[in-house]
Structure formats: structure tokens, C-alpha cells
């Protein structure tokens, strides 16, 4: 499930840029809504780089309590904390030596730690808690957020100098509503993944595929992934049908068969509708999702 699906023009541009900068040491700043696949892209960049054999260390800045964030990120020396590791602890920044440090949800990093992170980014060194001598590391940085850091800078909750230091190579990952042509291929990918995981042989009805193409995925790729996993497990028949969908889906979208009217749409929207119809026709003329993906 960590494979990135690249079929739409929007994702092709993202993927091409990511591959182009993968071997550089420049800091990459991933932006996008929740669930668009920022961590998947970060891992793809790492695995496409010369650092791929070294560690990929993820730091979820929103999940680690503020009280222990500094010790988790930078480590501490022997005897620094009562109840801590008696021999001290190596921090996540040091664990990422020669590899990639992925700073997820960077907008949640406490203001008091942002100066120390800035030093790490600028000098590739930091001082663990309780130590005097700094530790030098060779690390590639990738940061990600779904928040607007420019607004946070204006509000005084995020350092301006850190923002510009992170914003070297910005990559914005489109939402699923901006890459609807990827949805059939994502469905196929997740269906194969969960069939393999649970040793099942589920298929999916073409009406469900079109329903999902039309649906507004507020949780983006992650929501689609979770939905496919749930349907693979709960559908009683081998083929997943519209009747297997939860009430949430049935209330949110009215599913219609056949063509889609272009009345009242601008040129871009009409083109999107046309591309969607081509995808649907490809699916309908194929026996399986795998065959459709080849076409």
C-alpha cells in the first residue's frame, strides 16, 4: 500500500519533480490536504535517492507530546532525566544519519523548538539535552504539512526564517478531486493489496467504480484506501456491489448511470467530464480492473 499511483497529468508532474530532485540534498517541502499521500511521496523520494539504503526516519510533530518532543528529536545524555534511559538516548535526528529525516505535520512543532530545528537544518548539527558538544549528522530533510504556514508566520506561531529554510523545493500534492482519473487505478491497486493481505478474491462492480469517481473524497486517498479495505472485508458476495456501501455514501452522492450533461460547465470542467467518460468506457469494455489499467 506504499506504492504511489501515477496516471493523471497532475500526479505525473508531481512524480517527475520528485524524481528530479531525489538525489539532491535540498530540503523538500510537501504540501497538501490530509490523506493525499505526503508520507508515501516522501518514502518514494527517499527510495529513489542515493540514500535509499540508509534509514528513513519519520517524526510526527503532531503526535509526540510537547513535553518530550525535544528529547525524542535530539536525544539526551546519561543521567539527564530521572526515570529516563540510564545510558541516555539517541534522538531521531541522529538515527537518520546518512538517510532521510521526514518531519511530518511540521506546523505542529512547538515554537520553542523551531530555533533548534533551524540550527539542525542550517548546520547539520545539534546538541542533545545534557550535552555540551554538538553532534554532526548527514541528513536529508523532507517536511510536510496540511496547514498554511504563511498564515502561521503572520500569526507569529511559526518562525519566518524556518519557513523559508524549509521552503526550498515545494511540492504540492493534488487532492483526489483534482485527479479523479486516478481513482479507478487506485481502486485496482488497493483491491489487489487487500485481496492479497486477506487471501480473498474480491472484485468490484463497475457501478461502484463510477460512484467512487463521482464521490467527493474529503479524506482523499487515505479515505478511499480505508473504504476499499472495509468493503473487501464486509461484502458477503465475491463482487462488491453498490448495496455494500454504507449509508454515508448513499446519502452523500446520488449515483446516475449513462452520460453526464455538460450544460452550465466551463471548458475545463467539460474536458474533465469527457476524460471521465473515456475512463468509464474503458472499464466497461474490459473484463477486469487489471485489463482496464493496461488499456
Swiss-Prot record:
Disulfide bonds: none annotated. Residues 4-233 form the Sigma-54 factor interaction domain. InterPro entries: AAA+_ATPase, P-loop_NTPase, Sigma_54_int, Sigma_54_int_dom_ATP-bd_1, Sigma_54_int_dom_ATP-bd_2. Coiled coil: none annotated. GO terms for biological process: phosphorelay signal transduction system; regulation of DNA-templated transcription. This is Uncharacterized protein in HyuA 5'region. GO terms for molecular function: ATP binding; ATP hydrolysis activity. CDD domains: AAA. Keywords: ATP-binding, Nucleotide-binding, Plasmid, Two-component regulatory system. Pfam families: Sigma54_activat.
Amino acid at each position: 500500500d506504499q506504492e504511489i499511483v501515477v496516471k493523471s497529468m497532475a500526479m505525473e508532474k508531481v512524480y517527475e519533480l520528485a524524481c528530479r530532485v531525489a538525489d539532491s540534498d535540498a530540503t523538500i517541502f510537501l504540501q497538501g490536504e490530509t490523506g493525499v499521500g505526503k508520507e508515501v511521496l516522501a518514502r518514494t523520494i527517499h527510495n529513489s535517492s542515493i540514500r535509499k539504503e540508509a534509514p528513513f526516519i519519520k517524526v510526527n510533530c503532531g503526535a509526540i507530546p510537547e513535553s518530550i518532543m525535544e528529547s525524542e528529536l535530539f536525544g539526551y545524555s546519561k543521567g539527564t532525566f530521572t526515570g529516563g534511559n540510564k545510558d541516555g538516548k539517541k534522538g531521531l535526528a541522529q538515527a537518520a544519519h546518512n538517510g532521510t529525516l521526514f518531519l511530518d505535520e511540521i506546523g505542529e512543532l512547538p515554537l520553542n523548538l523551531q530555533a533548534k530545528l533551524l540550527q539542525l537544518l542550517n548546520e547539520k548539527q545539534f546538541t542533545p539535552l545534557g550535552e555540551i558538544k554538538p553532534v554532526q549528522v548527514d541528513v536529508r530533510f523532507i517536511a510536510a504539512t496540511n496547514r498554511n504556514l504563511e498564515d502561521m508566520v503572520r500569526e507569529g506561531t511559526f518562525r519566518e526564517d524556518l519557513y523559508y529554510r524549509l521552503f526550498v523545493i515545494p511540492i504540492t500534492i493534488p487532492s483526489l478531486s483534482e485527479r479523479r482519473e486516478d481513482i479507478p487505478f487506485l481502486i485496482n491497486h488497493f483491491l489487489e493489496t487487500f485481496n492479497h493481505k486477506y487471501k480473498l478474491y474480491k472484485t468490484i462492480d463497475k457501478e461502484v467504480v463510477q460512484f467512487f469517481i463521482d464521490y467527493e473524497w474529503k479524506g482523499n486517498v487515505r479515505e478511499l484506501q480505508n473504504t476499499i479495505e472495509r468493503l473487501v472485508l464486509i461484502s458477503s458476495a465475491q463482487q462488491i456491489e453498490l448495496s455494500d456501501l454504507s449509508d454515508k455514501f448513499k446519502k452523500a452522492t446520488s449515483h446516475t448511470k449513462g452520460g453526464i450533461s455538460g450544460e452550465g460547465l466551463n471548458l475545463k470542467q467539460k474536458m474533465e467530464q469527457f476524460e471521465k467518460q473515456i475512463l468509464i468506457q474503458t472499464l466497461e469494455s474490459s473484463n477486469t480492473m487489471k485489463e482496464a489499467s493496461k488499456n
